[in-house]
Amino acid sequence: MMSQPAKVLLLYAHPESQDSVANRVLLKPAMQLSNVTVHDLYAHYPDFFIDIAHEQALLREHDVIVFQHPLYTYSCPALLKEWLDRVLSRGFASGPGGNQLAGKYWRSVITTGEPESAYRYDALNRYPMTDVLRPFELTAAMCRMHWMSPIIIYWARRQSEQELASHAKAYGEWLANPVLAGGR
């Protein structure tokens, strides 16, 4: 008997989604999978008033949490930062009694406006992407979640249609069975 694929909550945070070809292409396979819930934070919370109880309920219902967003000033868009600060609260995700996310999986899916070569100690951004994403990795650890290797689409605007299609195909295959497919 085959087990069901893990339930994935894909938290999508892009304030200008209509202008992001790469993110729209990446979302297409996710929207076709029955085990994936795509949750567009900017569509749900244009006023930034986050329904914390609703968001925490969504987190409880899923096994894998994917954070898909562009890299903004070496971090995430403002609404996702607000979401992280408000939803992953002490007593829910961390601290005494805060074990609701323990054992779940965290994966960041990031698009950037610069090439991979810009993320080195001797390059434009002065740090490799592993250092830039360290706050997210630490947040996952604080929540007792398993950190999975991030998916990074560098220089997203300069990716060809064929390259984006290839990324989307691989992403969709991973989303279909994320825990067995790995990514750590």
From Swiss-Prot:
Oligomeric form and interacting partners: Interacts with KefB.
Q: Which gene encodes it?
A: kefG
What family is it from? Belongs to the NAD(P)H dehydrogenase (quinone) family. KefG subfamily.
- Broad enzyme group: oxidoreductase
Q: Which UniProt keywords apply?
A: Cell inner membrane, Cell membrane, Membrane, NAD, Oxidoreductase
Q: Which GO terms describe its cellular component?
A: plasma membrane
What's the protein's topology in the membrane? Peripheral membrane protein
Identification of the protein by name: Glutathione-regulated potassium-efflux system ancillary protein KefG
The lineage is: Bacteria, Pseudomonadati, Pseudomonadota, Gammaproteobacteria, Enterobacterales
Which PANTHER family does the record associate with it?
GLUTATHIONE-REGULATED POTASSIUM-EFFLUX SYSTEM ANCILLARY PROTEIN KEFG (PTHR47307:SF1)
Its localization reads:
Cell inner membrane
Q: Name one GO biological process term.
A: positive regulation of potassium ion transmembrane transport
The UniProt record lists the keyword Membrane: yes
What exactly does this protein do? Regulatory subunit of a potassium efflux system that confers protection against electrophiles. Required for full activity of KefB.
Q: What is its main location?
A: membrane
Extract the GO molecular function terms from the UniProt entry. electron transfer activity; FMN binding; NADH:ubiquinone reductase (non-electrogenic) activity; NADPH dehydrogenase (quinone) activity
What Enzyme Commission number does this protein have? Answer: 1.6.5.2
Reaction catalyzed: a quinone + NADH + H(+) = a quinol + NAD(+); a quinone + NADPH + H(+) = a quinol + NADP(+)
